[in-house]
């Protein structure tokens, strides 16, 4: 307890030393625009406003659209006070260019390394020993969400793994349902493909490709199975998937138009806003019911160096960073978002069944994988995303040709 009090005092002193922390208008950019996301981001906004500042919302719909806009503004000398990005290498070039506020002294004063878990999250924010972002949650794409009533109406049991799901798909078609709700945005198809890689290829394959960058693993029979599953999934979607937003695909499951969706745990916030309960209206399968694992992606906030009112804005940035990792804000935000907290020292009594599954998985380090955003450069990620999207959208591309291109990408990956 004495250590915690000392850390709090040190952190307060650090914020004060950065400048006079008056009421600042803080423009915050992010891409949280769905119903569940809006409920979650309001937790952060309320905390910033309660601290005496003014949260100026800069929402930009769609992460794929938002990232280049955000990064371009910062690089072009038009910084916002704070911005959401993913944990990983999104802002690597801007950090190296010295355009981000250094949070290392605050992190040390508050003891972030003592309570942020897994430690790799903080590593993703670290460059040359200094910390430039604050992780706010743990998100993983490794989930499937299923509508229980759709399966009941189709006369089949709710699947417990991918093979059962694939076997039940014809029954759902015959009953008038779409077996798999998919959104056609590139990041959705790429993320879904990564889920197949873990669930059907196995943990060793995932690590060999995403960590060791092994072209041999990319050419393996296990990876062939992954490409075949993606090809099979083409036949489980509806004709209207192209261009569909992720939350619209989630709504298909919520409203009983589709049996399931492969999507990250942020989808859980949409079920919550709709008043649905895990284990009652919907079920969840981490790792497609095959490998219950999580990849440690998620969201982080960066604080671009201000170019006016520097001392006061820097103080406000440090105060906001401290708020984002505070215990109550972490609890309230992650319960609304459907994500897991980055703090290992809080009690989520109100967590639902799916969130508890995630917490149990997270408790075993062997079940925690780095996300591809943490291991591959933006260029390599872009090449892989282009391949996944082209393969899913174009049935004329064979499994063999797609895998051959994938091997080339991994062989030259950085």
Protein language model features and the residues they cover:
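Conserved N-terminal structural module of periplasmic/extracytoplasmic solute-binding proteins
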Residues: 21-97, 109-111, 158, 315, ...
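Extracytoplasmic/periplasmic substrate-recognition and gating elements
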Residues: 24, 46, 50-51, 76, ...
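Conserved C-terminal helix/tail region of periplasmic/extracytoplasmic solute-binding proteins
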Residues: 25, 47-50, 75, 152, ...
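Hinge/lid segment of periplasmic solute-binding proteins
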Residues: 88-141, 192, 283
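Short, solvent-exposed loop/beta-turn-alpha elements that line the ligand-binding surface or hinge
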Residues: 104-117, 184, 200-225, 273-278, ...
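Glycine-centered hinge/linker elements that transmit conformational signals in sensory
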Residues: 169, 211-243
């Amino acid at each position: 307890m004495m250590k915690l009090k000392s850390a709090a005092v040190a952190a307060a002193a650090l914020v004060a030393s950065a400048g006079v922390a008056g009421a600042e208008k803080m423009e915050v950019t992010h891409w949280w625009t769905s119903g569940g996301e809006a409920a979650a981001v309001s937790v952060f906004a309320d905390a910033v406003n309660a601290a005496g500042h003014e949260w100026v919302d800069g929402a930009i719909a769609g992460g794929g659209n938002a990232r280049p806009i955000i990064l371009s503004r910062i690089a072009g000398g038009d910084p916002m006070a704070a911005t959401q990005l993913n944990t990983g290498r999104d802002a690597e070039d801007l950090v190296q260019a010295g355009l981000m506020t250094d949070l290392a002294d605050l992190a040390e004063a508050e003891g972030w390394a003592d309570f942020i878990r897994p430690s790799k999250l903080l590593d993703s924010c670290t460059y040359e020993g200094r910390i430039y972002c604050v992780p706010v949650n743990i998100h993983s794409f490794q989930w499937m969400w299923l509508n229980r009533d759709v399966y009941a109406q189709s006369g089949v049991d709710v699947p417990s793994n991918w093979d059962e799901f694939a076997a039940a798909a014809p029954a759902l078609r015959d009953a008038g349902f779409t077996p798999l709700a998919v959104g056609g945005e590139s990041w959705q198809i790429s993320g879904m493909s990564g889920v197949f890689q873990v669930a059907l290829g196995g943990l060793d394959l995932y690590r060999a490709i995403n960590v060791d960058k092994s072209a041999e693993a990319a050419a393996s029979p296990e990876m062939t199975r992954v490409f075949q599953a993606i090809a099979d999934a083409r036949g489980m979607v509806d004709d209207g998937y192209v261009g569909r937003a992720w939350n619209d695909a989630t709504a298909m499951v919520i409203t009983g138009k589709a049996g399931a969706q492969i999507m990250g745990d942020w989808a859980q916030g949409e079920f919550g806003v709709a008043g649905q309960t895990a284990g009652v209206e919907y079920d969840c399968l981490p790792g497609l019911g095959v490998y219950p694992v999580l990849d440690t992606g998620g969201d982080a906030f960066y604080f671009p160096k201000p170019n006016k009112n520097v001392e006061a804005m820097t103080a406000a940035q440090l105060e906001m960073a401290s708020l984002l990792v505070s215990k109550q804000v972490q609890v309230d935000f992650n319960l609304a978002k459907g994500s897991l907290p980055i703090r290992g020292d809080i009690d989520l009594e109100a967590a639902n069944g799916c969130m508890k599954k995630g917490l149990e998985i997270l408790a075993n380090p062997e079940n925690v994988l780095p996300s591809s955003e943490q291991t591959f450069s933006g260029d390599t990620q872009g090449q892989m995303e282009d391949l996944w999207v082209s393969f899913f959208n174009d049935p004329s591309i064979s499994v063999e040709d797609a895998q051959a291109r994938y091997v080339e990408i991994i062989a030259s990956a950085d």
